[in-house]
Amino acid sequence: MAENILAVENLNIAYQGVPAVMDVNFTLERGKVLTIVGESGSGKTTVIRALMGLLPIGGEVTDGTMLFNGQDLRTLSKSEWRAIRGKDMAMIFQDSGSALDPIVRIGKQFRELFKSHVEITNDECDRRAIELLESVSLPNGADILRRYPHELSGGQRQRVGIAMALALDPALLIGDEPTSALDVTTQSQVVMQMLELAKEHNSAIVMVTHNLGVAAYMSDYIIVMKKGRVVDAGTPQDILENPSNEYTKQLKDAVPTLEGGRYID
């Protein structure tokens, strides 16, 4: 039986005392993909921010456990968070451009990421960064490293964000709707690259999306959230063929299909 890399039990989160997430439970094995689906305000992004220790001011985990490789994330100090964030777990933001430092060249940002966790020369940083950029379909890596974030397109910045998230071979990759700001063609390419790279690195993925079709395409397991609670959970086949909640049925009905009933990826 595969070992769980992540186990969340009875997770409760509040903002300034107001409950936002209630009694969320799930587990995830290494190399598997779990997707959290729900509308805006459902609590899905709050859950993954809690997993990364990135809840905004006023946000607090009020109850429950979040075990990562057997360690309760709620017990970590600031220095312990710095040690694992980026190295053992990493996050791809909805808009990676906003997560990049606008006044620092991409190459220097890669160097800072590598050197915060491993002893490495500048030349080796650059070599590894170029390899990572090539793996996300940015073949002109040396040129990308010389650029500032504003000199790149939205799709390029998002690919840079994915490359940086994968730079240190994290065991857990977390994505906050990382393709929603991209055009449809680029979305498909980026999702495929994420899955391929995660498989190559044997990383587990927790992904947030509002699109049940995307979730069904990429997931081993799906959680559906509404108003801070899990209202449905199961494999993609379970969710699409036998949804147990009316809200899940509504999400399913919103997914476009081709003639014959096959869902569009």
Task: For every predicted segment, state its role.
Residues R147-L152, Q156:
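Conserved ABC ATPase signature
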